[in-house]
Swiss-Prot record:
Organism field: Human respiratory syncytial virus B (strain B1)
InterPro entries: RSV_NS2
Gene that encodes it: 1B
Protein name, as recorded: Non-structural protein 2
Record's keyword terms, sorted: Host mitochondrion, Host-virus interaction, Inhibition of host innate immune response by virus, Inhibition of host interferon signaling pathway by virus, Inhibition of host IRF3 by virus, Inhibition of host IRF7 by virus, Inhibition of host RIG-I by virus, Inhibition of host RLR pathway by virus, Inhibition of host STAT2 by virus, Inhibition of host TBK1 by virus, Inhibition of host TLR pathway by virus, Interferon antiviral system evasion, Modulation of host cell apoptosis by virus, Viral immunoevasion
Taxon lineage: Viruses, Riboviria, Orthornavirae, Negarnaviricota, Haploviricotina
Top-level lineage group: Viruses
Length: 124
């Protein structure tokens, strides 16, 4: 009996210790669902049509990301996720290249827990 209690206690400790990682994996998964080829295409279209500079393009990217996140998870979880993103610096940030005055988003910068993601690696 004592062995079972020790195992249960150990499992509880492991679950408690891994909470930040599980939240990070949820956010990473949501980010991969939100930021798709279509999402990047829309950002690139905005950059071309409105002739945005890098600051404006980054702002447009983040606003669109947050709106999709809010729509996907609802207001209660949205607040929790954005607080986590702010605290741990896990907001996805775009990588832009300049094509003669027009910006193109080619991917997402790496964060503390995620590698660099290029638009060709994203979901369609």
């Amino acid at each position: 009996m004592s062995t079972t209690n020790d195992n249960t206690t150990m499992q509880r400790l492991m679950i408690t210790d891994m909470r930040p990682l599980s939240m990070d994996s949820i956010i990473t998964s949501l980010t991969k669902e939100i930021i798709t080829h279509k999402f990047i295409y829309l950002i690139n279209n905005e950059c071309i049509v409105r002739k945005l500079d890098e600051r404006q393009a980054t702002f447009t990217f983040l606003v669109n990301y947050e709106m999709k996140l809010l729509h996907k998870v609802g207001s209660t979880k949205y607040k929790k996720y954005t607080e986590y993103n702010t605290k741990y610096g896990t907001f996805p940030m775009p990588i832009f290249i300049n094509h003669g005055g027009f910006l193109e988003c080619i991917g997402i910068k790496p964060t503390k827990h995620t590698p660099i993601i290029y638009k060709y690696d994203l979901n369609p």
